[in-house]
């Protein structure tokens, strides 16, 4: 990609991020906004990849219709049929959890555990996490490349062993150090 494409994609992401934060901080319930808009966010995020011919438009039209496997992971995401049952349960959990921090950690983890799309689940999980964080007054948080291995190991442990403590502790440190 040329500099214009990179700049365009970065600015597009910033605009989406700004609109999400503005809506959530404006008093709207974060879980309702995410449930209503996350599919559109996904399509907006990946539209440039469709336009570039990297992925097919059908790949961003809805939940995946094939089984997906994660490279270098022992976790096998839910079947396509189970995804359709699990996503409403996730959004119900987010609606009923009063604590923004808990919504952020569980929302991110459960979304990536379900893995509803063929690609981009980690990015969408982090986007969902940030929407929940913003609803609690936390700053937008980036998982930097220098800790990506720790992040991936923590999410792998949570997904495979069912132990989310390391993942929650890692996210807590990242959010706390995000000034």
Describe these PLM feature segments.
Residues 1-179:
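FIC/Doc superfamily catalytic core
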């Amino acid at each position: 990609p040329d500099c214009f494409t990179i700049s365009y994609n970065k600015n597009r992401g910033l605009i989406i991020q700004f609109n999400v934060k503005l809506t959530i901080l404006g008093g709207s319930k974060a879980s309702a906004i995410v449930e209503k808009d996350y599919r559109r966010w996904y399509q907006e995020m990946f539209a440039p990849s469709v336009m570039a011919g990297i992925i097919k438009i059908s790949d961003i039209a809805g939940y995946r219709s094939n089984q997906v496997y994660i490279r270098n992971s022992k976790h096998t995401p839910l079947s396509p049929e189970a995804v359709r049952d699990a996503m409403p349960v996730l959004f119900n959990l987010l609606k009923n959890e009063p604590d923004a921090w808990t919504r952020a950690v569980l929302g991110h983890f459960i979304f990536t555990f379900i893995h509803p799309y063929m690609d981009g689940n980690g990015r969408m999980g982090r986007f969902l996490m940030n929407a929940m964080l913003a609803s609690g007054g936390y700053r937008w948080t980036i998982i930097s490349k220098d800790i990506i291995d720790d992040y991936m190991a923590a999410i792998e442990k949570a997904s495979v062993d069912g132990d989310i403590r390391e993942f929650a502790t890692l996210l807590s440190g990242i959010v706390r150090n995000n000034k």
